[in-house]
């Protein structure tokens, strides 16, 4: 990514996003930063700037392998760059109730992480795949789709959790 190449030689490169958000963060209740699944400099910037992190876990074969690496990265970020970083929760995504593998992943994640797992599960949905290709959020693309209702449910769950 071009931005990662630009940041490589910058001093305090891990804090660039945090510094950029400083002037606007009080204007919002939530600022969502969607990161690529890689653990590069942009993700490190996001974790350094964040108050909390939602960890998406696809209900697929290698999902739990990547989770371990991400949890280790979060621990490192907490230790070095952002001691206040919390894990908001684990979000199960791309769930298909017809597939045994999806159900097994849900069971494993819930068994090992219990209360850290959001009750909301994002089901596999064609509209969720189509929305980005039209440059739209799922809410703008099709607010009545199962994907939209899943994400609205997640938003309500997070708001309720943080209002207690």
Where is each model-derived feature located?
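Acidic, proline/glycine-rich intrinsically disordered inter-domain spacer in sigma factors
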Residues: 5-8, 100, 139-143
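Nucleotide phosphate-binding site architecture
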Residues: 123, 129, 139
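C-terminal boundary of histidine-terminating zinc-finger modules
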Residues: 132-150
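P-loop/Walker-type NTP enzyme "switch/lid" segment
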Residues: 1-26, 81, 131-134
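Generic alpha-helical secondary structure signal
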Residues: 16, 41-42, 69, 133, ...
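Conserved catalytic-core segment of NTP-binding enzymes
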Residues: 22-126
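C-terminal alpha-helix
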Residues: 154-164
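Short, structured helix-loop boundary elements
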Residues: 14, 64-67, 148
């Amino acid at each position: 990514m071009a931005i990662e190449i630009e940041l490589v030689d910058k001093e305090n490169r891990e804090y660039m996003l945090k510094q950029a958000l400083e002037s606007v963060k009080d204007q919002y209740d939530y600022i969502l930063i969607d990161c690529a699944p890689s653990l590069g400099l942009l993700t490190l910037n996001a974790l350094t700037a964040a108050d909390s992190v939602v960890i998406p876990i696809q209900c697929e074969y290698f999902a739990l392998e990547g989770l371990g690496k991400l949890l280790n990265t979060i621990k490192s970020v907490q230790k070095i760059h952002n001691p206040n970083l919390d894990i908001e929760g684990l979000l199960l995504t791309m769930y298909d109730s017809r597939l045994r593998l999806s159900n097994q992943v849900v069971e494993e994640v819930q068994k090992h992480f219990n209360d850290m797992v959001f009750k909301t599960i994002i089901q596999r949905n064609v509209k969720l795949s189509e929305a980005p290709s039209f440059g739209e959020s799922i809410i703008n693309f099709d607010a009545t789709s199962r994907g939209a209702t899943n994400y609205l449910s997640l938003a309500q769950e997070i708001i309720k959790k943080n209002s207690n």
